[in-house]
């Protein structure tokens, strides 16, 4: 898994997805889809593009989120168990890329064990309560803090994640905080 910033150029997106050998890309808007399609020919490993938040149907390699989830629901418990058992602690879980301001982005590879240990350490350090924690996801998921907290840590303890609007950092976050009333709220120093 790797995250790509929505502000990245099409060329930066192509570089990162090719470097990561991504075979599935998830985009959250028609704009991001068009950006990706403009460099699609440079991505030989890419097999599918999933468009999140759109109900539209597409041809070929682009599918909407609901159709993507339906594909997963067809997997039986046995196949899922086999995939889980096929994972090893030293296998890659995520490649976290730098912003690439001065050159091509650099990728830092985090293993399954690294992510698991980091989540367990954060749960213990912050005394998170299993099945009771509620958090708001508002940082770009391409950021490692969002990946650890929103994708791995809170789900690993049965907590709840509320995804804020795309414009959360432009003013709507306070409204979301008031409505959701999270048990924890994290942020980054600027």
Predicted features along the sequence, with ranges:
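Short beta-strand->loop structural element characteristic of the AMP-binding/adenylate-forming
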Residues: 1-34, 107-109, 159-166
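ANL superfamily adenylate-forming
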Residues: 31-89
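Conserved pre-ATP/AMP-binding loop-to-beta segment of ANL
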Residues: 73-97, 104, 128-134
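Conserved AMP-binding/adenylation subdomain of ANL enzymes
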Residues: 116-134, 141-190
């Amino acid at each position: 898994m790797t995250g790509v910033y929505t502000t990245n150029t099409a060329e930066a997106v192509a570089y990162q997805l090719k470097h990561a050998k991504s075979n599935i890309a998830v985009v959250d808007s028609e704009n991001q889809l068009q950006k990706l399609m403009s460099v699609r020919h440079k991505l030989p490993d890419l097999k599918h593009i999933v468009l999140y938040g759109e109900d539209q149907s597409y041809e070929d390699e682009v599918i909407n989120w609901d159709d993507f989830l339906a594909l997963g629901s067809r997997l039986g418990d046995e196949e899922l168990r086999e995939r889980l058992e096929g994972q090893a602690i030293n296998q890659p879980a995520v490649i976290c890329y730098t912003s690439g301001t001065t050159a091509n982005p650099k990728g830092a590879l985090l293993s399954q064990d690294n992510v698991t240990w980091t989540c367990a350490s954060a749960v213990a350090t912050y005394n998170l309560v299993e099945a009771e924690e509620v958090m708001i996801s508002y940082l770009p998921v391409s950021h490692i803090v969002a990946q650890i907290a929103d994708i791995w840590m809170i789900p690993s303890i049965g907590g709840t994640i509320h995804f804020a609007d795309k414009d959360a950092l432009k003013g709507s976050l306070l409204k979301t905080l008031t409505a959701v009333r999270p048990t924890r709220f994290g942020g980054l120093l600027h």
